[in-house]
Amino acid sequence: MVRLLRYGTIFGPLKDRWRYLYKRDLYKRRLEAGPEPERFRSALINWNYDAELYACTHRFGEKLNIESLRNAMTDASFLKQIVKQRTEAGLAATDQTTLAFTHNQELAKQGKQIAEDFLQKALHYWYPKFPQEGIEAITKFLLSESTIADISSGLGFKTLIRCDIPSPRPTMLTNALFAFIGSINENTGRSRAEVFVADFILTHLVGKDINEIWQVKNPMGLLTKVLEENGRQAPESRLIWATGVSSVLSTYVVGVYSNKEFLGKSAGATVSIAEEMAARDALRRLFETDEKRAQIPFDKLYKKGLLLDK
């Protein structure tokens, strides 16, 4: 009865007991062999690189030259690998000048500069009171290798990049995305490249607090500096109220004022923590980056601010 339940009910009819043993043996062999080595996508028989490039241009709605896109997806390591193979084969062409394509370093520089200029312009437009140091910190976050590599991988560039390893490194993914922006600039103009940056890079700020991206180490010092630049008196901290002072759950609420004018307030477990958080709240109010401020309106960005004003 036990055998009948084991082989007859769970794994099919009793006559198919060999099937269970056969599959179990295959499974053990698969575990002993280990994972398959990583292979290039081009090693598979159904790979058509030209078709993939053509599909890429239509996926983003861009009219790009296929050769320009091919260069944008070619990493410098791939070029070195080709030159090395040709040299080992004894061919006369041992330098990249004789090859029909080039790497994406120059396009990547152009694309990164376009993205940086546009992001700073867009952030200045929507956050006019935000300091330049904060704008640069947000731009640096958006153009960081981890952010751009994540965007590039999500856009499907991972299988399009030609490099010397099966899985492109984050640096390769970053260069490919910047080179793609540079290729758009060369083929259809800077305005289309900026639209791409707005659609796929600037939107990375959705759901994020820019006040947390810019790490201010001394908020009270920055608040004092901002008030002095605007001709206002230095900030003054005042304890509004406290509760549970003699317990482990003590709470203090501190307000920040300038010439009896309320700037901000916050709570904290200690007076120093509450004072620091109150200074940060005052900075948010002065820079107009508090929670009441809406996210970047991309419809206004397209119509009024930047992209159509060319």
Protein language model regions, located:
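Double-stranded RNA-binding/processing signature
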Residues: 1-310
